[in-house]
Every structure is written in C-alpha cells, then in structure tokens.
Amino acid sequence: MLILKSFVYTVVASFVSLFIFGFLSNDPGRRPGRKRI
C-alpha cells in the first residue's frame, strides 16, 4: 500500500510540474503583461 501511495504521489507531482512548466512557458507568449505568478 505504501508503494502504491508513493507511486501515485510521484505521478501526480510529475503531472503538476509539467502543467506548471507548460503554463509558465506558454503564458508570456500568449498574453504578455496580463497575469504574473
């Protein structure tokens, strides 16, 4: 159960990091100066 939970956490963390990286890389080109995080 612990291995399954750690695997799920790893997958979720990788998806979240990919989403944040894609958002930060696509946001300035799409709408510059509109929103900054």
UniProtKB/Swiss-Prot annotation:
Keyword entries, A-Z: Chloroplast, Membrane, Photosynthesis, Photosystem II, Plastid, Reaction center, Thylakoid, Transmembrane, Transmembrane helix
Pfam families named in the record: PsbI
Signal peptide from the UniProt entry: none
GO cellular component terms attached to this protein's record: chloroplast thylakoid membrane; photosystem II reaction center
Gene Ontology biological-process entries: photosynthesis
Transmembrane segments: 1-21
Subcellular location: Plastid, Chloroplast thylakoid membrane
Membrane topology note: Single-pass membrane protein
Purpose of the protein: One of the components of the core complex of photosystem II (PSII), required for its stability and/or assembly. PSII is a light-driven water:plastoquinone oxidoreductase that uses light energy to abstract electrons from H(2)O, generating O(2) and a proton gradient subsequently used for ATP formation. It consists of a core antenna complex that captures photons, and an electron transfer chain that converts photonic excitation into a charge separation.
Stated name of the protein: Photosystem II reaction center protein I
Organism annotation: Bigelowiella natans (Pedinomonas minutissima)
